[in-house]
Design a protein with these regions (language model features):
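Conserved C-terminal helix/tail region of periplasmic/extracytoplasmic solute-binding proteins
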Residues: 202, 206-283
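Helix-loop-helix "hinge/cap" segment bordering the ligand-binding cleft or interdomain interface
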Residues: 3-114, 165-171
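Short amphipathic alpha-helical coupling segments at ligand-binding clamshell hinges
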Residues: 168-180
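Short catalytic/ligand-binding loop motif for oxyanion handling, primarily in non-cytosolic enzymes
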Residues: 28, 35-37, 75-77, 127, ...
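Periplasmic-binding protein-like
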Residues: 44, 179-210
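Extracytoplasmic/periplasmic substrate-binding proteins
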Residues: 101-171
Length: 283
């Protein structure tokens, strides 16, 4: 319902539509980010195409990819899911069997990656926010993010703006949001007043602005092939999410689960954690 207040032509509609609007407040994304893995393409002779499926990506022939995905899957475990909780229904969006399967696959993947001991010739793990690191020499890279279980990619909201709808001046609050998301503010040009400009050259501390031209500007130093890859990845972002306590819960589960010595102990940790989650959702 809030989309009608904004100029969608200048904003990343997919990111903005992930906002939260209820009877009490409106929370709208301002910046977002996701991790990218970049390899010099000529260093990946075994791969002609990077899979968009998480399990297939983890099993690709190229050892460098197996290793980096294995290492990062522990750090970004929560991103292998999209949303995991339905807050309205107070239920998990994945079955216990699905969660356990991903746990087992991730533990096995991390174990395999540690055993590879492969020398990774990658440009590095970069975030969308640090995209310029891939530019300079116009090197052609193979660039990809970590897919989630649905086969798309997850973007995380890194900064958001919000208003309380029960304020004494709700119309002014909405007008403030409209101003904040205007091209004048997001582009850095500022708003022209009588003898000065206000809200000019605003810089966000983290993430990429929801303003479409911001990402285009950041990509200018990249090779044409790299720019094309980034644009394709942007189109394949299927989930946009706010960070939550469930990120920590998922990563904690993985850490405890893989620390167990046998399957019986793993099963005990898993059942105990799921039960704790169910109780937490009902509060």
């Amino acid at each position: 319902p809030y989309m009608k207040y904004f100029d969608i032509d200048i904003l990343e509609e997919k990111i903005l539509s992930a906002g939260v609007a209820n009877e009490e407040q409106i929370l709208l994304p301002m910046t977002y980010d996701y991790f990218l893995y970049a390899f010099t393409t000529q260093d990946l002779p075994e791969n002609t195409k990077i899979s968009r499926n998480w399990l297939e990506l983890a099993r690709q022939k190229e050892k460098a990819i197996q290793q980096i995905v294995g290492q990062r899957s522990g750090i970004q475990f929560f991103n292998t899911f999209s949303e995991i909780v339905d807050y309205k229904k107070k239920t998990l969006l994945y079955s216990e069997e699905q969660i356990k399967k991903v746990l087992d696959e991730t533990v096995a993947l991390k174990t395999r990656s540690l055993a590879l001991n492969w020398e990774i010739k990658d440009t590095g793990v970069v975030s969308l926010n640090d995209l310029e690191e891939l530019g300079g020499e116009k090197t052609v890279h193979t660039v990809f993010p970590m897919p989630n279980q649905e086969g798309g990619f997850t973007a995380n909201v890194t900064l958001y703006a919000g208003i309380n709808k029960n304020t004494k001046q709700p119309l002014k609050a909405v007008s403030f949001l409209q101003m904040l998301y205007s091209e004048e503010v997001l582009s850095g040009k500022g708003i022209a007043l009588e003898d000065r400009r206000e809200a000019s050259n605003i810089r966000f501390p983290q993430g990429v602005s929801i303003y479409k031209k911001e990402l285009e500007k950041r990509m200018r130093s990249l090779s044409r092939q790299d720019q094309k890859q980034i644009k394709t990845i942007q189109e394949e972002v299927k989930t946009v999410r706010f960070y939550s306590v469930w990120d920590r819960e998922l990563n904690s589960l993985l850490s405890k689960y893989e620390a167990q010595e046998d399957e019986k102990q793993k099963e005990h940790v898993f059942i105990k954690t799921i039960q704790k989650w169910k109780e937490k959702m009902q509060k």
